[in-house]
Amino acid sequence: MAKKGNRIQVILECTEHKASGVAGTSRYITTKNKKNTPDRLEIKKFNPVLKRVTVHKEIK
């Protein structure tokens, strides 16, 4: 059997969207190497609902 890889799929969710009170949510799916980055990802991505770049954090 082949062993499991180090690269896993993670979901990033906007942190500023909940506080704004606007309906909907902004989520992105990406991959990360769990050996190189064991902690949660925090990336600035575009939020199409708020129409600006916001911080997206990994959820699980």
UniProtKB/Swiss-Prot annotation:
The keyword Nucleotide-binding does not apply. It comes from the Bacteria. InterPro entries: Ribosomal_bL33, Ribosomal_bL33_sf, Ribosomal_zn-bd. One of its GO terms (biological process) is translation. This is Large ribosomal subunit protein bL33. Belongs to the bacterial ribosomal protein bL33 family. SUPFAM superfamilies: Zn-binding ribosomal proteins. GO terms for cellular component: cytoplasm; ribonucleoprotein complex; ribosome. The gene is rpmG. Keywords: Ribonucleoprotein, Ribosomal protein. It comes from Flavobacterium psychrophilum (strain ATCC 49511 / DSM 21280 / CIP 103535 / JIP02/86). One of its GO terms (molecular function) is structural constituent of ribosome. It holds the Pfam family Ribosomal_L33.
